[in-house]
Amino acid sequence: MGSPKKNENKGFFAAMTSGFSMFGTAVSRSVNGVQGNEGVEVINPEGGKEDAEEEAQKGRWKDEERDSYWKMMQKYIGSDITSMVTLPVVIFEPMTMLQKMAEIMEYSHLLDQADECEDPYLRLVYASSWAISVYYAFQRTWKPFNPILGETYEMVNHGGISFISEQVSHHPPMSAGHAENEHFIYDITSKLKTKLLGNSVDVYPVGRTRVTLKKDGVVLDLVPPLTKIHNLIFGRTWVDSPGEMVMTNLTTGDKVVLYFQPCGWFGSGRYEVDGYVYSAAEEPKIMMTGKWNEKMSYQPCDAEGEPLPGTELKEVWHLADVPKNDNFQYTHFAHKINSFDTAPAKLLASDSRIRPDRYSLEQGDLSKAGSEKHSLEERQRAEKRTRETKGQKFTPRWFDLTDEITPTPWGDIEVYQYNGKYNEHRDTAESSSSASNETDLKSIEFNPWQYGNISTE
């Protein structure tokens, strides 16, 4: 068993690579691109003058800033730069990593369908399509803010979901998240790891993602591919996620293996995803194909991976309408995440929405966003010094560190488990308060801090 790329000598994907399948080939797309056909994006992997000019028009890098950061970044080549480099606010988006974690819930109805599905293989089609759907949002090239230790993000009013995420560690940076509705439970512990390669950076999704489908108690485990950010400083920045995504049904042993094609010149292969749902006996049952920025489809297949006679390709997911010319390439759902429409009553003061640097950037005030970001970082350093002086440790509020260590392709990760206290908090908040309006919520002062006025500690 393996990815389609590893099975090129047989089955449905052999037809793809030989050039006569109904999905076409990367070669034909490249030729079409040379001929000037519309719809093909010409990608220069190394960047170029035109790309640099396009980035400059976005207001991200001035020439003097670009040169200065290039000189600074050279000494970090080969290093994990997750939290060791202070970056200018001009390259940030008005969202934190905790909020970005919630973007995977946009198409949560696919998990509802997976829970209701009786077919164990089709169930994996729904669930893996849900996992793919977030990659449209992941292609944004703006950097989200690193959460402050103890920062949280809450979301309600979407698909019956209650979502909570919390920054549980600062060094190394780690976040934990939990979401639940009547159909599923979602849990994630994330410890992103990076490697600077000069003008590009690899982002390794070190973490553990589990989905429990409530109807049958099925537990799904997700291992996503790495992400590559190209032309970080010079050229037009773009994002790719080449490699395998594997979702395993830990209850039955069935799994789906999807291969994200790497992007080549003229955009060949970019966005394409192909793979199979396998039984526990490693026999292909359903083939899947599509583009992570558009749609996914599936079709039952035989033991050789060929479509079964009398069946047809069926769409399982497609991208919802997105805003045109959005400043940060946000989807409508991303705007909902930032809004107070999805905020619960008695919003926690540690919530990312009311973080002053994020909010200032959202309002277009880069100068204030930069100064607020600096103030928060200085306060966090002061808290760390106070914590060390007192001989104390930070304890997350909504998640508990377990003894479990989970291996990943990019290193081990300590697992944080949702402790259930947020449910109790929400029940109390909703029963004891009237609904707050947006003005009331905006008046809350951002407070993720462990200590009070640390200058007097």
Swiss-Prot record:
Region annotation (Disordered) ranges: 37-61, 363-393
One cellular-component annotation, GO: cytosol
InterPro entries (alphabetical): OSBP_sf (IPR037239), Oxysterol-bd (IPR000648), Oxysterol-bd_CS (IPR018494)
UniProt entry tagged with the keyword Transport: yes
Tissue expression as described in the entry: Expressed in roots, leaves, stems and flowers.
Record has Transport as a keyword: yes
GO BP: lipid transport
UniProt feature, compositional bias: Basic and acidic residues: 47-61, 370-391
UniProt entry keywords in alphabetical sequence: Lipid transport, Lipid-binding, Transport
GO molecular function: lipid binding
Superkingdom in the source lineage: Eukaryota
PANTHER family per record: OXYSTEROL-BINDING PROTEIN 8, OXYSTEROL-BINDING PROTEIN-RELATED
UniProt family annotation: Belongs to the OSBP family.
Function (record text): May be involved in the transport of sterols.
The protein's name: Oxysterol-binding protein-related protein 3C
Organismal lineage: Eukaryota, Viridiplantae, Streptophyta, Embryophyta, Tracheophyta
